[in-house]
A protein has these predicted regions:
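Generic structural signal for well-ordered, non-membrane alpha-helical segments
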Residues: 10, 17, 43, 47, ...
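Glycine-rich phosphate/diphosphate-binding loop of Rossmann-like nucleotide-binding domains
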Residues: 34-53
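N-terminal small/polar loop signature for handling phosphorylated ligands or for N-terminal nucleophile
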Residues: 47-142
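Glycine/threonine-rich beta-strand-loop-alpha-helix active-site module
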Residues: 98-205
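Carboxylate- and glycine-rich phosphate/diphosphate-binding segment that chelates Mg2+/Mn2+
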Residues: 179-247
Length: 247
C-alpha cells in the first residue's frame, strides 16, 4: 500500500506570504528563525521580502546561504547588519544540488543560534538543503551517506524547529515532498522519508514574480518535466496523476 502525505499546512495564493507568517507569532508563538537561502537571492535583495515581514511581526532571524560564509543577524550589537560567523574551509559545489559540507555548516550554525523556526527561501536545492540541515540540527550524529544507503534508520523529527518552505521558483515541488538530494564530487545521496517533509509550505505568486525571465522559462520547463515524469511513474497514484495533469 502506498500513502501520500503533504505538509500540515499549505498556503497557495497570490499575496499569501504575510498571512502565513502571522501564524509564527500569533498562533505558533515562535520567535527565532534561521533563514536558508541562495547567495544570489540575498545579494540581489530578494530575501528582503521575507525579512521585512519578520521584522514587522517581531521575529528575530539569522540568514545562512549556500556560500556558508554569509551569516547575518537581525539583532547585531549595534544597528544595521553584521557578519557573526564564517565557516573555515567552506566551498561551493559546481553542482546545483547542495553538498555535505554546506548542510553540515548550516546545521552547525543552527546549533549555535538555536532557532525555533527554519525557513527555506529559494529553489528546490535550497529547500533540499534545509531539509537536511534540520535533520542534522535535531540529530547531530546522523550519518547522511549511511542513511541514504539504507545502512542506518532514518531518525525521527524531534520538533526543535518548525520548518517552513517558501519556493521562489517553479520546479519539482520540493516544498511539499519528502525527498532531498545531496551531491558530492563523485556521488549523489538521495534521501526519502516523511521525516523530511516541511511543516508548512507557502507558495505565493508574488514571490515567484521576482524571477528574471530566463529563470522563469527554465523553471517552467523543469516543472513540466517533473509533472510528466510523475504522471508516467510506476509509483504514481490516482491522486498524484491528477496533480501532475493539472500542473
Amino acid at each position: 500500500m502506498l500513502k501520500f502525505r503533504t505538509p500540515d499546512k499549505v498556503y497557495f495564493k497570490k499575496g499569501c506570504l504575510p498571512v502565513a507568517l502571522n501564524e509564527l507569532k500569533y498562533e505558533l508563538k515562535k520567535s527565532r528563525a534561521l533563514i536558508v537561502t541562495d547567495s544570489n537571492l540575498y545579494r540581489n535583495g530578494y530575501v528582503d521580502i521575507l525579512t521585512n515581514l519578520l521584522n514587522e511581526i517581531g521575529v528575530s532571524y539569522s540568514v545562512f546561504s549556500d556560500s556558508c560564509a554569509l551569516i547575518l543577524t537581525s539583532n547585531p550589537p549595534e544597528n544595521g547588519y553584521s557578519a557573526i560567523d564564517e565557516i573555515e574551509g567552506c566551498y561551493v559545489s559546481d553542482s546545483a544540488k547542495p553538498n555535505l559540507f554546506t548542510v553540515q555548516a548550516g546545521a552547525g550554525i543552527a546549533r549555535k543560534q538555536e532557532p525555533d523556526i527554519l525557513i527555506a527561501f529559494g529553489g528546490g536545492s535550497v529547500i533540499d538543503a534545509t531539509k537536511v540541515i534540520k535533520l542534522l540540527y535535531e540529530n547531530p550524529d546522523a550519518n547522511i551517506p549511511a542513511i541514504a544507503e539504507g545502512e542506518t534508520a532514518f531518525p525521527p523529527k524531534k520538533g526543535k524547529a518548525y520548518f517552513i518552505a517558501i519556493p521562489t521558483t517553479s520546479g519539482k515541488g520540493s516544498e511539499v515532498s519528502p525527498f532531498a538530494e545531496i551531491a558530492e564530487v563523485d556521488k549523489t545521496y538521495q534521501l526519502a522519508s516523511y521525516e523530511l517533509l516541511p511543516d508548512m509550505a507557502i507558495i505565493d505568486a508574488d514571490v515567484m514574480a521576482t524571477m528574471p525571465p530566463e529563470l522563469t522559462a527554465k523553471s517552467g520547463i523543469s516543472a513540466l518535466y517533473n509533472a510528466v515524469y510523475a504522471n508516467i511513474s510506476s509509483l504514481s497514484t490516482d491522486y498524484t496523476e491528477g496533480l501532475a495533469e493539472r500542473a
